[in-house]
From Swiss-Prot:
Listed Gene3D superfamilies: 1.20.58.1710, 6.10.250.2610
Compositional bias per record (Low complexity), positions renumbered to this chain: 211-232
PANTHER family recorded: MEDIATOR OF RNA POLYMERASE II TRANSCRIPTION SUBUNIT 8 (PTHR13074:SF9)
Protein origin, superkingdom: Eukaryota
UniProt keyword list: Activator, Coiled coil, Nucleus, Transcription, Transcription regulation
Family of the protein in this entry: Belongs to the Mediator complex subunit 8 family.
Organism of provenance: Aspergillus fumigatus (strain ATCC MYA-4609 / CBS 101355 / FGSC A1100 / Af293)
Name this protein carries in UniProt: Mediator of RNA polymerase II transcription subunit 8
Length: 249
């Protein structure tokens, strides 16, 4: 191969810098695990893992973009290289095969990738879209049929709640009977959606069942507001993925 030009040397230097960053990130994580007592916090470990993941993605993209050049390069020592004092480094540079452990990782990754590409039983994008369009309506209808919110399902009520074997020592009470016995004043409140189903006939779309909330729901909402501010969904998802506690608003 002819001598390298400046652009090719720049690509090699970028490869070296990315590998150095990955090595330092891994060394930092290993050091924190070995030296910290107790172990580092979850947010710290998650942050270090995120940095390592970003470094791996950067190296993978860089190697893929410059695959032709890197696969054609051949390393050999120059006359001025200290081969006697730097023999281990020279052996690593001149090595043509991967480490046995690394070679096993690579082969397993290639097999997993090939099997994923050959998996023709997976749903297509149109089938997935149709599934997501069908699932919410069916789940809502199933929930309405079974009345998941109470202690007993609709089928258990029809067969008699006294015949239901719960395995509990305490006696479960039917929520419908409690509601009929308690007399509370109905306040004017906003309507809410309690059911959804597909519209039959020529017109396409969905039909929604609207009903007033149960008595006392406004009081429950006021109690919830008094208990503390609600945490936004974005902060909850951020805490689940990064371990960083949500900020109080």
């Amino acid at each position: 191969m002819a001598s390298l030009n400046q652009d090719q040397i720049k690509i090699l230097e970028q490869s070296r810098q990315r590998l150095v960053q990955l090595t330092r990130s891994l060394a930092s994580l290993i050091g924190s695990l070995n030296q910290s007592d107790p172990l580092p916090s979850w947010s710290s470990l998650q942050s270090q893992a995120g940095i390592i993941s970003n470094n791996l993605v950067s190296i993978s993209e860089h190697l893929a973009d410059n695959k032709d050049l890197l696969s054609a390069l051949v390393a050999y020592p120059g006359p001025s290289y200290p081969g006697r004092t730097q023999a281990p480094t020279l052996e690593q540079l001149l090595r043509t095969k991967l480490d046995p452990r690394v070679e096993d990782w690579v082969s397993r990754g290639r097999r997993a990738g090939a099997s994923a590409l050959e998996d023709r039983g997976a749903l297509s994008e149109s089938a997935l879209a149709e599934l997501w369009d069908w699932a919410p309506v069916e789940a809502n209808q199933e929930a309405r049929r079974r009345n998941w919110g109470g202690n007993f399902t609709l089928e258990e009520r029809e067969m008699g709640i006294q015949n239901v074997v719960t395995g509990l020592r305490r006696q479960l009470e039917d929520e419908d009977e409690e509601a009929s016995e308690s007399e509370e004043e109905v306040e004017e409140e906003e309507m809410e959606v309690v059911g959804v189903r597909r519209r039959s006939g020529a017109g396409a779309g969905l039909e929604f069942d609207i009903a007033a909330p149960a008595p006392g729901s406004r009081q429950q909402q006021q109690q919830q507001k008094a208990a503390g501010p609600a945490v936004p969904l974005e902060d909850i998802l951020r805490y689940m993925t990064t371990g960083i506690p949500p900020t109080q608003r």
